[in-house]
Amino acid sequence: MALNKSELVKLAKTVASANPTSQVAYSFGEEKFSYADLNETLRTELRELAGTYSLYRENKNTIFSIIEETIDDVLPKKVMEQYASFAEIKTYAQGDKPIFTQRITASAKRRAKRFVTKVGLAGIYEVFKLDGKTLEVPTEAFGGAAQIGFEEFLDGRVDFADVLDVIMEGLDEAIYIEIEKALRATIDSLQDTNKASETGFVESTMDNLIGIADSYGKSTIYCTYEFAATMVPAQGWVSDDMRNQKWNNGYLANYKGHNVIVLDQSFVDETNTKKVIDPSYAYIIPVGADKPVKIAFEGNTIVDEYVNKDRSREVQVYKKLGVATLVTNNICVYVNEALTPSI
């Protein structure tokens, strides 16, 4: 093996953090390389560790350790990059209580009723009031697995660079799903003036909700591409520049002075029939307010394997994390009932 373990861990972290579609060069050591070059180097190095069954059996604990260290370092950073605009993300040691300290502003003390929505047992979401200035986010184990066919492995058609990529993507999507579930679960707890449902996009309804959220600070709109594409003012108000922006981007990135943040969308499975994020919801959240989503990572990632009867292997990964939402009466929700999560 040309690289020692610490160098291989660094390489794996660099590859896992990189954007495969970007043309930029990434630093490794004292040189810069393209993503394709780094990824191919990682594949070559891992083949030297597990290119045959005997090598895999000899080195699997080293491989698992590399995967664990990579996930522990890269996953929180990826989550931060994607969700930091509306989520607070912290990492805790195993056994430490994930505690988030709440910033209580004068207006919050005067007007904001605070409560927390978290995941309960059997997927039931519980709502309870927040006492004091801290909240604890309970964590639980989230798992992902990548199956490696024994013959595919021996033939070299599957390698551990693929395994790492599949696991990272799966854990990231699991977090995204939990965020969406937690946000959806808060809607029933909001007061009636802070939420509205329409069959389509109604400009006056959105303006009313923005006015409520803006009384606590300039608000930002968070929604999927599908929802953003419907947010078009009355025809008489559309300028040529807005038409060009809509044509080029598919949506307007600014609605009457308020930024529109488009959330990533994907499908639950390969059938492409059910979306991960329900596109009918838009969340209007004041900038500078407490970020409503709290994400806690606890302890180290654990990687192990399970051998099936056909000798195929499942590389299983467990990571403890928790997602909760802190809801105040400065958050508003618009539901466009014309949009559905199913196709």
Feature names for model-found ranges:
Residues 1-56, 340-343:
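N-terminal alpha-helical "arm" segments
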Residues 185-256:
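Extended, solvent-exposed, turn-rich assembly/linker loops in the middle of proteins
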Residues 2, 43-54, 237-343:
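Sequence/fold signature of self-assembling virion shell proteins
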Residues 14-21, 48-52, 56, 69, ...:
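Surface-exposed polar/charged interaction patches
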Residues 53-57, 61, 65, 150-161:
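Short, charged/polar micro-motifs that form catalytic or ligand-binding hotspots
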Residues 57-142:
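Assembly/oligomerization interface modules of large self-assembling protein complexes
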Residues 73, 77-78, 82, 225-227, ...:
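Short, flexible beta-strand-to-coil junctions
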